[in-house]
């Protein structure tokens, strides 16, 4: 594989999984050139460079590109899968929703016989080492917001991420009552504990602030992720959660998993 066009799909953290794993491929494939099509849409309402500093393109092997019709994932109800048909004249192979747990060298070997590869996915292409995640750096204004929130946290802070709204799988396993039990257990274990709470449900956020007076730090504002401002807030929440001592998170949530992986912190999934 000499040239890879990667179309990261889904929300912020799904896209980061795909993107950073592609970065891992570059570390092991020195002739590989990666073109990333980061489309701004209802799943992710901001460009990568509006959220993070670019530590990819200085390598000379990464290019972020605007989306073209030919780059669109093949979805019958949207485009009758026509882009995939036309891509077959341009690319050696196409993979939709590709995912592997291979090491980077194994993934490169899998695609070795194809010169031009197209992948659209919200999953990792290969294993991503912790140091690649640690290289992810929010833009300066967001770092300032992250630091300000971290300064408000106590020495014993547990992160809490509650995913509600459109994630039915998460709601079916990680109920508000399950989070409350985990938080009360944390207080019983350490009466000095406080919490950083990130959630997409403002009513639930207010409920927990009342349940645990003086213990809950959170980012003020509308928790929607449908705007650029909302995506900026998501990055802030993600990095603040990653700086807590441990995380109580939601089942089937890439945001929960990414926060824990980013910080290298223990993760407990609220269940029940």
Task: Report residues per predicted region.
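Active-site regions of enzymes building and remodeling cell-envelope glycoconjugates
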Residues: 49-54, 212-219, 265-267
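Secretory-pathway luminal glycosyltransferase catalytic domains
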Residues: 45-189
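A donor-sugar binding/catalytic signature common to diverse glycosyltransferases
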Residues: 10-11, 16, 20, 234-272
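Short hydrophobic beta-strand segments
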Residues: 1-9, 33-35, 116-126, 155-164, ...
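Short, solvent-exposed loop/turn segments at secondary-structure junctions
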Residues: 11, 38-43, 124, 163-167, ...
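Catalytic donor nucleotide-activated moiety binding site of glycosyltransferases and closely related
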Residues: 161-165, 184-228
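A short, glycine/small-residue-rich beta-strand->loop->alpha-helix junction that serves as a flexible
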Residues: 8-17, 167-173
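Histidine-anchored nucleotide/phosphate-binding helix
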Residues: 15-29, 179-187
């Amino acid at each position: 594989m000499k040239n890879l066009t990667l179309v990261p799909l889904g929300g912020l953290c799904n896209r980061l999984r795909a993107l950073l794993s592609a970065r891992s491929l570059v570390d092991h494939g020195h002739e590989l050139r990666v073109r990333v099509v980061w489309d701004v849409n209802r799943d992710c309402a901001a460009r990568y460079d509006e959220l993070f500093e670019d530590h990819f393109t200085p390598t000379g092997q990464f290019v972020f590109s605007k989306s073209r019709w030919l780059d669109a994932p093949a979805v019958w109800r949207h485009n009758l899968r026509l882009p995939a048909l036309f891509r077959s004249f341009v690319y050696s192979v196409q993979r939709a929703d590709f995912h592997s747990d291979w090491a980077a060298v194994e993934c490169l070997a899998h695609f070795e016989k194809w010169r031009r590869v197209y992948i659209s996915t919200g999953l990792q292409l290969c294993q991503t080492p912790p140091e690649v995640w640690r290289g992810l750096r929010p833009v300066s204004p967001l770092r300032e917001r992250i630091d300000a929130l971290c300064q408000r946290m106590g020495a014993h802070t547990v992160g809490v991420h509650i995913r509600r709204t459109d994630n039915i799988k998460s709601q079916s396993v990680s109920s508000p009552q399950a989070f409350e039990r985990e938080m009360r257990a944390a207080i019983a274990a350490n009466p000095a504990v406080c919490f950083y709470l990130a959630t997409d449900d403002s009513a639930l956020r207010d409920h927990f602030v009342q349940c645990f007076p003086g213990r809950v730090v959170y980012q003020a504002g509308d928790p929607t992720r449908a705007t650029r401002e909302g995506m900026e807030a998501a990055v802030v929440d993600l990095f603040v959660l990653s700086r807590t001592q441990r995380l109580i998170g939601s089942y089937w949530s890439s945001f929960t998993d990414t926060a824990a992986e980013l910080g290298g912190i223990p993760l407990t999934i609220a269940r029940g």
